[in-house]
């Protein structure tokens, strides 16, 4: 702002007959409902002269400075000003806008005219978006700082673009205009429904919203669907931001592109960033979370949704700003720093992604332009009754584009290594959690959501092509076929899916008294009937430690010693079973209390001599064993990697099997689910020789009883369990033992797997 002193001299010209716009145009402009305000405002040539118009409702005076001469505008009506220039071919000019702030003279704001600039979106961008094929949509929609070279100097500002095809008008509001959008009205670009405006001098870090004049007659103030940053909730404005981050994870990204995660180790700790250690920022998490993950040997961290969400109690699963990391913990570049630090430490980063539904907040996506825009118009398809949310219209090209580009955005802009897609089952079935008569069938009369299937296939095919080496994981709780089958073979194209059947059966079994487990032995063997039908992740997730379900510790019966033994055994079983393992924060040391997003993990339990400390030490050791033994992960998805030793010893409550690696290695895993020690248990093995005890969950180091086999067993040529050799061993109660052959004594010969049990 500046005083009027020293302004260029005023120039008077006979007013043009075109000075005042047509009444209909003027009325639409004043109502905030003009589709092309640029056709009225800015500079326009008429025969031998030029008219410049400006809409500045709070100004007391407006002038245009052209070549050092000051041309004072006439106030026409309600803040609309205009001036006539006695020539054509205007090259450039600046506006001087005076505001009365109570002083002797008005304060003058010098600026370029927003309505002088051409659209910042190209025809190809608009075409690709309307076709649903703009893979870098975030580069054209949303808020983008720009710099233009003009004859009168450099102009800096921000371009804004938003999709609202049924809106009667769109205005930009923010701190820059005291949240009054009359002077900053966007234009619609052709028939695309995209509204656009470049606003000079808009500051980076400035707050903004769009005022949408909806087709339903309702005027609402909306956050930008493509916002890259936001205010800290519960505030809801979007924030202009740019990235200046320099990545330091080239080695990781190169390695990622060369690998297929399906055939690599994956031991994942699932983390809710806000409650892992409450109060930490992204920058602080970069130190503390990275150190913790590395110390305890996990290969990946999976973050509950990071995208901005207004309600903390949703844990991030009701997203309002899909392109903005939550501002609760810092800036987007600070989130990049967190990912970068994890990568530099050799840790993969997976984020939960929620394309199934979104909340109904009046300032967000719902009925965005006064119509069902992002959501399906038919409430029988467009609303998720259980969650009180809207369901995306997966059949609309622009909506699919918004979501597919969003998946790419997280993978490419933030270098995340994978997306865990939430609530896939709710997307696949039109009758999901709906009463009879409360859903509509597809074109073939079925309940499959064909549009959602097409979207998931498109998303998976696109992200895997654009970002080789990333992983997509489906939370899919039904038996939908081909979830991890490639899209060119008719599958959905996910890399992996959560094995909810394994999780439910296993947690049901370990919750039983060991005395009764013999009668439920099938719960622990059934998963092997389908273990290789998909590429599985074995989840013990946040969903299993909330809402009265208890914790792993709480599910175990008996005193603390038995509870700890049961937790250790369960985790060793999870790590040994085919599939990648995922464990929610706190369960890696047997947290006793259920999780709540309102408080942190119960770190106080980690006394060095506590049962929790023992469980965590075992996790650290077990992760080291896991990553160094290819038998535990290289054949996770094929029968070649697994063979039962004995699946049917329900009398003793013992399960045993072999895991094979693609390098010919073998690991024998045996589990005693009874509460009694078996002191003379004979186990069939592939060959004679020394078999080293790689893991004993009852070890004293883990605060177990220390019962075991002194580190090894000797296998002889006595056949047992259909194997040519066997060893007699001690099985502690509620324990898991892993054995590997001593390589110098006996080379391992890979054998074909046996059939899964039928009983």
Curated annotation (Swiss-Prot):
Enzymatic class: transferase
GO biological process, one term: glycogen biosynthetic process
Coiled-coil parts of chain: none
Disordered as annotated region, ranges: 1-22
UniProt keywords, alphabetically: Carbohydrate metabolism, Glycogen biosynthesis, Glycogen metabolism, Glycosyltransferase, Transferase
Pathway: Glycan biosynthesis; glycogen biosynthesis
GO molecular function: 1,4-alpha-glucan branching enzyme activity; cation binding; hydrolase activity, hydrolyzing O-glycosyl compounds
Matching Pfam families: Alpha-amylase, Alpha-amylase_C, CBM_48, GlgB_N
GO cellular component terms given for this protein: cytosol
InterPro entries the record matches: A-amylase/branching_C, Branching_enzy, GlgB, GlgB_N, GlgB_N_E_set_prok, Glyco_hydro_13_cat_dom, Glyco_hydro_13_N, Glyco_hydro_b
EC number: 2.4.1.18
Active site: 422 (nucleophile), 475 (proton donor)
Family under the similarity heading: Belongs to the glycosyl hydrolase 13 family. GlgB subfamily.
Subunit structure, as described in the record: Monomer.
Function statement: Catalyzes the formation of the alpha-1,6-glucosidic linkages in glycogen by scission of a 1,4-alpha-linked oligosaccharide from growing alpha-1,4-glucan chains and the subsequent attachment of the oligosaccharide to the alpha-1,6 position.
Protein name per the record: 1,4-alpha-glucan branching enzyme GlgB
Organism: Mycobacterium sp. (strain KMS)
């Amino acid at each position: 702002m500046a005083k009027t002193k020293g302004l260029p001299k005023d120039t008077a010209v006979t007013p043009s007959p075109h000075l005042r716009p047509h009444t209909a145009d003027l009325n639409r402009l004043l109502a905030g409902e003009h589709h092309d305000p640029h056709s009225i405002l800015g500079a326009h040539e008429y025969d031998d002269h030029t008219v410049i118009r400006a809409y500045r409702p709070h100004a007391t005076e407006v002038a245009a400075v052209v070549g050092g001469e000051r041309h004072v505008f006439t106030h026409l009506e309600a803040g609309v000003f205009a001036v006539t220039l006695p020539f054509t071919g205007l090259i450039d000019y600046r506006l001087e806008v005076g505001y009365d702030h109570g002083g002797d003279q008005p304060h003058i704001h010098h600026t370029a005219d927003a309505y002088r600039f051409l659209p910042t979106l190209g025809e190809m961008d608009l075409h690709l978006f309307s076709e649903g094929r703009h893979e870098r949509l975030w580069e054209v929609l949303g808020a983008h700082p720009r710099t233009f070279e003009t004859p009168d100097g450099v102009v800096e500002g921000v371009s804004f673009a938003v999709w609202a095809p049924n809106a009667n008008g769109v205005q930009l509001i923010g701190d820059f205009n005291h949240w009054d959008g009359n002077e900053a009205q966007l234009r619609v670009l052709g028939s695309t429904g995209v509204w656009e405006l470049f606003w000079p001098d808009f500051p980076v870090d400035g707050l903004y919203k769009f005022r949408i004049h909806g087709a339903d007659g309702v005027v609402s103030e909306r956050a930008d669907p493509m916002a890259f940053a936001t205010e800290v909730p519960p505030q809801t404005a979007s924030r202009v931001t740019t990235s200046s981050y320099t990545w330091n994870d080239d080695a990781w990204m190169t390695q990622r592109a060369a690998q297929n995660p399906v055939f690599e180790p994956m031991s994942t700790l699932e983390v809710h960033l806000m409650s892992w250690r409450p109060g930490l920022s992204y920058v602080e998490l970069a130190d503390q979370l990275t150190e913790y993950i590395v110390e305890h040997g996990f290969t990946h961290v999976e973050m509950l949704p990071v995208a901005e969400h207004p309600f903390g109690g949703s844990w991030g699963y009701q997203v309002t700003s899909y392109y903005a990391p939550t501002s609760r913990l810092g800036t987007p570049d600070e989130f990049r720093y967190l990912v970068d630090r994890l990568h530099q430490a050799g840790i993969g980063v997976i984020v939960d992604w929620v394309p199934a539904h979104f909340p109904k907040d009046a300032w967000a996506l719902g009925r965005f332009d006064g119509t069902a825009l992002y959501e399906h118009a038919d409430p029988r398809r467009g609303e998720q009754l259980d969650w009180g949310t809207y369901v995306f219209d997966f059949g609309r090209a622009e909506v699919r584009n918004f979501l597919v580009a969003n998946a790419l955005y997280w993978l490419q802009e933030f270098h995340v290594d994978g997306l865990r897609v939430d609530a896939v089952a709710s997307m696949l079935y039109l009758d999901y959690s709906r009463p009879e008569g409360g859903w509509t069938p597809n074109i073939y009369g079925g309940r499959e959501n064909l549009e959602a299937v097409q979207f998931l296939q498109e998303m998976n095919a696109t992200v895997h092509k654009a970002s080789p080496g990333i992983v997509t994981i489906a939370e899919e709780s039904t038996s939908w076929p081909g979830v991890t089958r490639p899209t060119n073979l008719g599958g959905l194209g996910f890399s992996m899916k959560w094995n909810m059947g394994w999780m439910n059966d296993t947690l049901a079994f370990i919750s039983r008294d060991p005395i009764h487990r013999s009668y439920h032995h099938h719960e622990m063997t059934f998963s092997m009937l389908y273990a290789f039908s998909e590429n599985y992740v074995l989840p013990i997730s946040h969903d299993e430690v909330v809402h009265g379900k208890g914790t792993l510790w709480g599910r175990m019966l008996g005193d603390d010693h038995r509870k700890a033994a049961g937790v250790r055994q369960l985790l060793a079983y999870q790590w040994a079973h085919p599939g990648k393992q995922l464990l929610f924060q706190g369960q890696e040391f047997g947290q006793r209390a259920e999780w709540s997003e309102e408080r942190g993990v119960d770190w106080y339990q980690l006394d060095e001599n506590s049962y929790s400390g023992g469980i965590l030490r075992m996790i650290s050791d077990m992760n080291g064993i896991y990553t160094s033994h290819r038998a535990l992960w290289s054949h996770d998805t094929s029968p070649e990697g697994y063979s039962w030793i004995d699946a049917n010893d329900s009398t003793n409550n013992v399960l045993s099997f072999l895991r094979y690696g693609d390098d010919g290695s073998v690991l024998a895993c045996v589990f005693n689910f009874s509460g009694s020690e078996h002191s003379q248990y004979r186990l069939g093995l592939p060959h004679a020789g020394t078999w080293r005890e790689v893991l004993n969950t009852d070890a004293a180091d883990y605060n177990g009883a220390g019962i075991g086999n002194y580190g090894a067993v000797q296998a002889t040529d006595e056949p047992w369990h259909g194997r040519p050799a066997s060893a007699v061993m001690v099985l502690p109660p509620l324990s898991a033992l892993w054995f590997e052959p001593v390589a110098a004594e006996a080379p391992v010969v890979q054998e074909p797997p046996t059939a899964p049990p039928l009983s």
